[in-house]
Amino acid sequence: MSLLQFSGLFIVWLLATLFIGTLTWFEFRRVRFNFNVFFSLLFLLTFFFGFPLTSILVFRFNVAVVPAEVLLQALLSAGCFYAVYYVTYKTRLRTARAQAASSGGGLFTMNRVETHLAWMVMMAVALVSVGIFFMHNGFLLFRLHSYSQIFSSEVSGVALKRFFYFFIPAMLVVYFLRQSSRAWLFFLVSTVGFGLLTYMIVGGTRANIIIAFAIFLFIGIIRGWISPGMLAAAGVMGIVGMFWLALKRYGLNVSGDEAFYTFLYLTRDTFSPWENLALLLQHYGDIEFQGLAPIARDFYVFIPSWVWPDRPHIVLNTANYFTWEVLNNHSGLAISPTLLGSLVVMGGVWFIPPGAVVVGLIIKWFDWLYERGNHEPNRYKAAILHSFCFGAIFNMIVLAREGLDAFVSRVIFFMVVFGACLVVAKLIYWLLDSAGLIQPRRRRAAPLSPTETL
């Protein structure tokens, strides 16, 4: 990449970043938080944060990258995608009166006991899954020699990892029932502690830690306990923390220029794998478009082999197609194609505009559900709605990094398990109530004041 090419790319990157950043800032000033703000920040992080890191790698360490014209196509594709997404998100599908008329009632309600039972069931799902996985494998972080081994046949019970995450929605219910600064700090300590435990047991998976910390920060923004400046500082600390965990995961011991180089490429690959989109565009002529099949194939991993004995052992979703067919990488790891990359694999660049419309509608639905929780008079139902919305933040990160096919399968799995936990909680409540074990809460007598006597 020449200096002239870099200058052109920098101008496009700066304009696109200012465009998305300005819209996001106005939305933040208007509502402080919604899922459009979150997705916009996530989109900026995924497709634009990595450009400065790539530039330093090129000019400081002479790292080879794809041609500048392909990088330009990647930046323009991301900018155009966001423009279509934003118009879709801002398009009102119904009148305000119709939206208000549909905001009452609802199909379900929650009482105090059912809500507490719900978070206990979700926590039990997570803890039992972790316990069974640990009994089969021990602490994989200290047993395995490379991170790719966690996907090998040496590790059993891999499907259980999908249930670990439900510890976070459980703690979200606990927080939203109280919404105090003490409950907020308890959420951080409990979820990050659980994330560190799963990091050691699974052998280096950092997702639970990242998600817990991100939710903690956004709750702080909503409540006014964290300023945007504090959020930026916490983000820097988070990046450094994730780099340290990555070093431990891969067993790297680096210093000096090597440490700086390692920090740049690990941070880029962790937070902003935008070059993967450029790689797909570079090999565009070699891609056999997969259509919508990757969305269906991604559900295969949730089907037990005893239910489907002939289930394919290799799932050709967009991430695996990108890893095996484009990169010719058969190390056992699946490399993230990004949201736009998954659309390119499925249908080429013509899938990007309709994909942006679909994503806009998805984020619009989550914001509608979030607003329902904000205006819900039943605090227990509101806690469940907010727990569901914030718990789905992980799936939105999957959407931006892994692609639309991975998002669809994971969000449906999350909805099914979350809903099943609510059904189990209601069933337990019904059994307890039928046995006469549920008693109405008695109002406590007001304590005597120091001047009152019996």
From Swiss-Prot:
Compartment(s) where it occurs, according to its Swiss-Prot or TrEMBL record: Cell inner membrane
Record's bilayer topology term: Multi-pass membrane protein
Keyword Cytoplasm belongs to the record: no
Domain of life: Bacteria
UniProt keyword terms in alphabetical order: Cell inner membrane, Cell membrane, Membrane, Transmembrane, Transmembrane helix
UniProt family annotation: Belongs to the WzyE family.
NCBIfam families: PRK02975.1
Protein name: Probable ECA polymerase
